[in-house]
């Protein structure tokens, strides 16, 4: 028994030395990155990019869809939708909010926030929630695909968004511009 304990203590010490070595390598790596950034800032080679005034309000190059799965998000989903509509005024934006049939508070909050804006579509899932977020997103994707088939236009970008997060006014334009450069 004493022999086994000795081997375990030796193994523990070797494992600690191994972990300490790689921790120090990671520390040196992070410290080098921080020093490089500081040197670039002090020499004026690293600058913070400034977006031009009005960036983010330009028309999109194609349609953009935002998919928002929501279950028991009545307290936040209305604010998220209202903020998104105000921050992203582009008419080629479509917001799909996925709710569940057994969550009337979230359905009501999403519908109230959408008011009469045709860019927002509240999609009520046919099964009782909660299911997985992926299941709700799949339901939203099917609704989006049905809208594409009906209208004959395809979405150039599909953005997944959380019900409680706010958007930056320039984010949609930046995504659109990056996709145009990529394609």
Indicate residue ranges for each PLM-predicted region.
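Internal catalytic domains of large membrane-associated glycosyltransferases
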Residues: 46-183
């Amino acid at each position: 028994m004493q022999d086994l304990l000795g081997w375990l203590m030796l193994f523990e010490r070797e494992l600690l030395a191994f972990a300490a070595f790689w921790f120090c390598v990671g520390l040196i790596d992070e410290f080098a990155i921080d020093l490089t950034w500081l040197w670039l800032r002090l020499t004026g080679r690293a600058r913070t990019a400034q977006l031009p005034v009005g960036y983010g309000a330009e028309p999109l190059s194609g349609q953009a869809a935002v998919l928002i799965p929501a279950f028991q998000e009545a307290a936040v989903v209305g604010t998220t939708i209202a903020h998104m509509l105000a921050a992203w005024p582009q008419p080629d934006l479509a917001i799909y909010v996925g709710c569940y049939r057994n969550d009337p508070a979230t359905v009501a909050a999403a519908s109230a926030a959408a008011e009469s804006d045709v860019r927002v579509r509240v999609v009520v899932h046919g099964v009782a929630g909660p299911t997985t977020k992926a299941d709700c997103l799949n339901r939203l994707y099917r609704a989006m695909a049905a809208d594409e088939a009906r209208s004959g236009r395809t979405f150039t970008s599909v953005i997944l968004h959380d019900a409680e997060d706010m958007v930056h006014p320039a984010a949609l334009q930046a995504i659109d511009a990056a996709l145009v450069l990529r394609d």
